[in-house]
Amino acid sequence: MNIISVGVNHKTAPIEIRERISLSEVQNKEFITGLVSSGLAHEAMVLSTCNRTELYVVPAMHEVTGEFLKEYLISYRDARKEVRPEHFFSRFYCSTARHLFEVASAIDSLVLGEGQILGQVKNAYRIAAEAQCAGIMITRLCHTAFSVAKKVKTKTRIMEGAVSVSYAAVELAQKIFSNLSLKKVLLVGAGETGELAAKHMFAKNARNIVITNRTISKAEALAEELGTNQVLPYESYKEHLHEFDIIITAVSTKDYALTEADMQPAMARRKLKPVIILDLGLPRNVDPNISKLQNMFLKDIDDLKHIIDKNLEKRRRELPKVHAIIEEELIAFGQWINTLKVRPTIVDLQSKFIEIKEKELERYRYKVSEEELQRMEHLTDRILKKILHHPIKMLKAPIDTTDSIPSRVNLVRNVFDLEEPNQSHF
């Protein structure tokens, strides 16, 4: 029995290669179904995201190796011109389990501790299960990975602290104003960065969000998605600056979108009530002289990146705790695999002794009363349980290496004269 993982990710291949080898959900299901239905694999699962495409396979044939699976995926994607086996990693046995545990717990991600990957692993398992390609091995592997991720999230701080510019901006605003639900927010720019910032604001209970954008339809679409339905024409939003406690800018512009001259009258009308401006533009959208105004807090990308760097360092300090959780679960998973390997021998051993018991009792069936026969049966059951206890315990005992499992199995089968088991996936 073996479980293999091969794949490309942000560590092994550039984005062009990752894009070329990635699979849609339809392709994912078709690919794993083909592996299993063709008799190449007992089980198969594919995890395909923007940063990785990874296969998890329980081979049904000795020929199905890591190299075979690399070539099989390259051929399926018709990507031989662009993709080479050197772009892939390979993992085997418990190394495969360790890798998936690290992926699910977000320590193998491009951004350490990012929260999306667990949902993506769960989706990969769902696809495999629906395609009837997830058997006992992949099911146990994935559910253990889910358990690892849950423990990592609850017992460590690996996912705490903002590590994206848009989220760092919102986190900073929350630190300054505490309750964002009481604040009015202006978003200048409805592009990708602005959209992320608005969604993070909404997630932190900000509900009074007004959006302005050069293309008004884009602002309206985002406002509708958030459910705020509040927009301002880009040409006139500066007339309303005094209304806002938080201003987020994320536009592409050669000149400053906000200047000191814009904010001076706004602050006067606010009677110097505090305002935070979060400049997410590159180049900067906001005149740095604005920060000289009283009760004005201006933070740009460099300020936010400093926050991100500090948060990433805090996350890195949590890595030893994460690895300890993974090691603990890996030991348990390895012991479970070992139990699977010895299970046929345990079943054969028990069956042989039960057969002997039944034959011997049959000899006395008509020589003793039914009540005496039942007592004899209970007695022999207790004797068998005690006789088999030690060999079964020895087979199940934890081991340091998988090499000793065959020797244990062979010893028991030889001592008790058990026939060779039928070949199976375990």
UniProtKB/Swiss-Prot annotation:
NADP(+) binds at G189, A190, G191, E192, T193, G194. Substrate binds at T49, C50, N51, R52, S109, E114, G115, Q116, Q120. InterPro entries: 4pyrrol_synth_GluRdtase, 4pyrrol_synth_GluRdtase_dimer, 4pyrrol_synth_GluRdtase_N, GluRdtase_CS, GluRdtase_dimer_dom_sf, GluRdtase_N_sf, NAD(P)-bd_dom_sf, Shikm_DH/Glu-tRNA_Rdtase. Coiled coil: none annotated. One of its GO terms (biological process) is protoporphyrinogen IX biosynthetic process from glutamate. It comes from the Bacteria. The active site is at C50. One of its GO terms (molecular function) is glutamyl-tRNA reductase activity. Catalyzes the NADPH-dependent reduction of glutamyl-tRNA(Glu) to glutamate 1-semialdehyde (GSA). This is Glutamyl-tRNA reductase. It comes from Chlorobium chlorochromatii (strain CaD3). The gene is hemA.
